[in-house]
């Protein structure tokens, strides 16, 4: 006699292993039930062990997924082995293809699970924007200088050689050279200006006057150029000197007159190198807004050249006709009060303001390196102009004599 429980088990086994039509539905039902049982057992295990370990959870979930795929593979193979006995080959093949497509879709779902990311999308976008801004910020000074060159306002020794050559060609037409000579003769007769020095000579001459940099930073001396720089900062609505604002600045207020911007920028470069530590620590608001490079070029360099102007033209006699000494008098150089005298500095400021045109037209087109003098003379010969009359060499020799 068969017990009730045994009969039920036989019926269940028959439902699972029968080759009759519809047995595939029973198999799917069993697979779904088995799947839920696996999840239930696994959830119970996770609740009792390592509930707070994300890495172990992920490992168990991965193993469960692999087990499910393996069970489905085995069940599918067993089912098709049974079905192949009762169905034609074409129907069996079609069923196999359908099952394989379903299996591939399930595997794709498992593979396409997104990885956990520490950064949110909005955080990533903000970082990208910040990096782009930093990269753009690095281009500001170069763009500003290049735009100023196009306006014939500025020349930087840091430009690439092709930029220098194109600018020199632009300023070397016959008409410009003739005009340059006219401007030179006019200003030399009116102000008795000193000769233009080459860059190495200029840096050697202005070196004793560079301590004014620290005195300006420490507020020990008032500065006309610092005053103009501070006004530009206060009138700005931006946190730093932008390209647009730089283009709108009146550079005549930040130019050391007859020395020209080309030599002024060379002095600014030297100041930035020598006083890098002081310029990067405890920066005043005006310096931060301008940036170290521009602050050195348009504030500290012209102030240094102002002191040098007082010495070169001997403004202590309140006359621009005094003969320029060849060497620095040590006694005067050691007395800052002499060069910091407000009356003397006002005389120098006025002279530099009155000779800005000379600096732009004459000084900035004169050779700044000694080897450039030969190029200048070759250009004069090409234009069939008298070398002795038009070259800058003549004015350096005549002035020294």
UniProtKB/Swiss-Prot annotation:
Residues 35-59 are annotated as: Disordered. GO terms for cellular component: cytoplasm; nucleus. It is found in: Cytoplasm; Nucleus. Its main location: cytoplasm. SMART domains: RTC4. InterPro entries: RTC4 (IPR039024), RTC4_C (IPR028094). Transmembrane segments: none annotated. Residues 35-48 have a biased composition (Basic and acidic residues). The keyword Repeat does not apply. The modification Phosphoserine is found at residue 23. Keywords: Cytoplasm, Nucleus, Phosphoprotein. Belongs to the RTC4 family. This is Restriction of telomere capping protein 4. It comes from Saccharomyces cerevisiae (strain AWRI1631) (Baker's yeast). The lineage of its organism: Eukaryota, Fungi, Dikarya, Ascomycota, Saccharomycotina. The gene is RTC4.
């Amino acid at each position: 006699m068969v017990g009730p429980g045994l009969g039920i088990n036989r019926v269940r086994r028959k439902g699972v292993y029968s080759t009759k039509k519809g047995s595939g539905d029973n198999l799917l039902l069993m697979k779904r039930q088995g799947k839920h049982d696996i999840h239930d057992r696994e959830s119970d295990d996770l609740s009792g062990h390592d509930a707070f370990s994300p890495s172990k959870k992920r490992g168990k979930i991965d193993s469960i997924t692999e087990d499910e795929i393996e069970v489905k593979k085995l069940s599918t193979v067993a089912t098709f082995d049974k079905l192949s006995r009762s169905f034609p080959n074409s129907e069996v093949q079609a069923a196999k293809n359908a099952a394989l497509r379903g299996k591939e879709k399930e595997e794709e779902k498992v593979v396409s699970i997104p990885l956990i990311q520490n950064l949110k999308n909005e955080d990533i976008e903000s970082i990208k924007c910040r990096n782009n801004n930093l990269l753009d910020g690095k281009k500001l000074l170069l763009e500003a200088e290049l735009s100023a060159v196009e306006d014939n306002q500025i020349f930087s020794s840091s430009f690439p050689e092709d930029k220098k050559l194109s600018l020199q060609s632009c300023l070397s037409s016959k008409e410009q050279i003739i005009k340059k000579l006219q401007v030179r003769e006019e200003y030399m007769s009116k102000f008795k200006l000193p000769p233009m020095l080459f860059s190495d000579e200029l840096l050697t001459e202005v070196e004793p006057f560079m301590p004014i940099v620290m005195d300006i930073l420490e507020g020990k001396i008032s500065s006309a150029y610092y005053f103009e720089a501070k006004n530009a900062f206060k009138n700005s609505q931006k946190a730093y000197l932008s390209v647009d604002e730089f283009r709108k600045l009146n550079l005549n207020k930040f130019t050391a007159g007859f020395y020209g911007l080309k030599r002024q920028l060379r002095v600014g470069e030297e100041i930035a190198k020598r006083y890098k530590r002081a310029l990067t620590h405890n920066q005043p608001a005006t310096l931060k807004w301008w940036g170290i490079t521009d602050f050195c070029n348009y504030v500290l360099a012209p102030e240094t050249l102002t002191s040098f102007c007082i010495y070169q033209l001997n403004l202590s006699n309140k006359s621009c006709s005094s003969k320029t000494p060849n060497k620095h008098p040590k006694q005067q150089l050691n007395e800052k009060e002499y060069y910091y005298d407000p009356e003397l500095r006002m005389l120098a400021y006025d002279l530099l303001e009155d000779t800005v045109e000379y600096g732009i037209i004459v000084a900035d087109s004169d050779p700044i390196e000694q080897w450039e003098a030969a190029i200048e003379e070759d250009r004069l010969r090409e234009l069939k102009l008298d070398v002795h009359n038009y070259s800058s060499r003549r004015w350096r020799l005549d002035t020294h004599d």
